[in-house]
């Protein structure tokens, strides 16, 4: 008898034997919430507990429809700009970070601010300020219009040039070849970013690297796990929202690593049964802003379709935890 591991899903188990002819799910580990998302979501929850609703949140706290809808039902009010927040009210800044001008606008309206910016995004902000003080040209690799990019660029608007994909490389101009550095959005594809850096370095031989890797540990870990399982997958399902950069990148990584097909789904109801025709192995993962309950829903739906064996594919163990913002930490 093939030994199995109970996965806590009706009808699903993880076999330690390779049975390629039986319908199965390869489940990426790690997946889902990263430390920054966990901190941001808990920040809004704690603010609601401490102050009661409404608690205003500038932009989606994280890029996931389920999370935003759940917090909205609990009393969070999501706005695009601080001028939509009543004077003197509480406003939480999202995990993606904000530019200094946003803090200034909040202060003018006497808003009580709680900063849920991911500490790894804050690190990139600090790097941008430091290099700007030293009069560097900063080449920021990222997606135009993404909240994180807007926030980072806002730290040093006169020094930052956005490089959005390989096409953006040729548009870059610099003042001093000895004073040019690249930084990046934290949720990009590692491979694509390194390709852009290599192209930039062909133009600017003295291009400096950031002091430490800007692409966050969770983004990298989730991409590595997908790369490990994709070659064995007929189909990869990435649980995540379409405005989630890191989730979209996982679909691209899966296809690039050998999966025959890959799709982004917000939840189980998004699965098109035609995708499963002729499919033996389905890979499942989730973006860094996705709660595990949505992954469980997908696994249950797959089990109903005969994919009742779940095999974990573990490439890293994550233990990092970030402290909550001081404004909502429990009293000692």
Curated annotation (Swiss-Prot):
CDD domains: lytB_ispH. The keyword Ribonucleoprotein does not apply. The active site is at residue 148. It holds the Pfam family LYTB. GO terms for biological process: dimethylallyl diphosphate biosynthetic process; isopentenyl diphosphate biosynthetic process, methylerythritol 4-phosphate pathway; terpenoid biosynthetic process. Its EC number is 1.17.7.4. Disulfide bonds: none annotated. Isopentenyl diphosphate binds at residues 63, 96, 146, 244-246, 289. GO terms for molecular function: 4 iron, 4 sulfur cluster binding; 4-hydroxy-3-methylbut-2-enyl diphosphate reductase activity; metal ion binding. It catalyses: isopentenyl diphosphate + 2 oxidized [2Fe-2S]-[ferredoxin] + H2O = (2E)-4-hydroxy-3-methylbut-2-enyl diphosphate + 2 reduced [2Fe-2S]-[ferredoxin] + 2 H(+); dimethylallyl diphosphate + 2 oxidized [2Fe-2S]-[ferredoxin] + H2O = (2E)-4-hydroxy-3-methylbut-2-enyl diphosphate + 2 reduced [2Fe-2S]-[ferredoxin] + 2 H(+). [4Fe-4S] cluster binds at residues 34, 118, 216. Keywords: 4Fe-4S, Iron, Iron-sulfur, Isoprene biosynthesis, Metal-binding, Oxidoreductase. (2E)-4-hydroxy-3-methylbut-2-enyl diphosphate binds at residues 63, 96, 146, 186, 244-246, 289. The keyword S-adenosyl-L-methionine does not apply. Pathway: Isoprenoid biosynthesis; dimethylallyl diphosphate biosynthesis; dimethylallyl diphosphate from (2E)-4-hydroxy-3-methylbutenyl diphosphate: step 1/1; Isoprenoid biosynthesis; isopentenyl diphosphate biosynthesis via DXP pathway; isopentenyl diphosphate from 1-deoxy-D-xylulose 5-phosphate: step 6/6. Its cofactor is [4Fe-4S] cluster. Binds 1 [4Fe-4S] cluster per subunit. Dimethylallyl diphosphate binds at residues 63, 96, 146, 244-246, 289. Belongs to the IspH family. Catalyzes the conversion of 1-hydroxy-2-methyl-2-(E)-butenyl 4-diphosphate (HMBPP) into a mixture of isopentenyl diphosphate (IPP) and dimethylallyl diphosphate (DMAPP). Acts in the terminal step of the DOXP/MEP pathway for isoprenoid precursor biosynthesis. This is 4-hydroxy-3-methylbut-2-enyl diphosphate reductase. The gene is ispH.
